[in-house]
Amino acid sequence: MTAALPTDLQAASLAVSTRGVAKRYGREFALLGVDLQVPEGAVYVLVGPNGAGKTTTLKLLLGLLAPDGGEVRVMGMDPRRQGPRVRAQVGYVPERGNWGYGYMTAGRLLQHHAVYFPAWDWEYATKLANAFELDLSRPVGKLSKGLARRVHLLLAMAHRPPLLVLDEPTDGLDPVMRDETLGMLAEHVAETGCTVLICTHIVHEVDRLADHLGVMRDGRLTAQMPRDTLHRMLRRYRADVPEGWQGAPGLDGTVIRRGGVGREIQWAVWGDEREVTRKLSESGATVRDAAPLTLEDAAVALLSRRET
């Protein structure tokens, strides 16, 4: 039996919540029983491999798709019934930006977009355009992938929405552009206090922003927790073990990932550090150190975990 990982954040106030959400395409379920909880003011990173259901989840939150079961709430509203109101308070960066207006200049696109958002802040939009080094006179259809991504981010941020929903926001950005863009996003979050939901499969790129982690695999949300809980409870233990060592029976269900060479083991284990160390020692292992995993390593460990 495997360790039960936390999936209920029990936050007093949630910007995003789903309960038992299911979505089916034909006979195949893209989502099954998803209970997503994003606290107000959090920067929540939802990770998973391609095809895990991340983009489908975001489209449900925006009312672009309807669930086949369960309940969705975004800032207390039902996107199916109040879709326009929800979208007016969300800044959305899609995974694939299909402009539909490729002939428009970036400046004209901003004017077009601003019409739909009463809270649009032109002064802030200009500041972002300058910070992102955007030439607003260029047609958006002729922009590089990285610059097009920055235009999407500007469109999402310029009306200072209470919720940003970003699907692979760093896709197409070179290392320098990525660092600058994430810096601008961090400043935006600090200034506005908005909630951010980021979907990605490249965790290290958004590591410095994240304070919550959700793990999605095969259409299910298998774990979600604050980052401090993750760092406290999931650690990598290095230990020397005697010849013929049979393992630590008391830890059978809590080992998230196993590794090591020869008589040295390197295990990612979920549990209280003192208790895990005690059980390893009682089994004959000599624990050399225990350290928290990076966010990316934790995500990989949780994604590779298999229920038994």
Language-model segments: residues:
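ABC transporter nucleotide-binding domain
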Residues: 179-273
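A short linear hydrophobic-aromatic micro-motif
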Residues: 138, 254-257, 286-289
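Short, surface-exposed acidic/glycine-rich loop or hinge patches that mediate macromolecular interfaces
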Residues: 77-80, 242, 270, 293
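Structural motif detector for alpha-helix initiation sites
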Residues: 40, 106, 227, 292-295
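C-terminal coupling/interaction segments
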Residues: 2-7, 264, 268-308
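ABC transporter nucleotide-binding domains
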Residues: 13-18, 23-217, 221-223
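Short, surface-exposed beta-strand/loop "edge" segments at domain boundaries and coil↔beta transitions
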Residues: 164-168, 244-246, 274-277
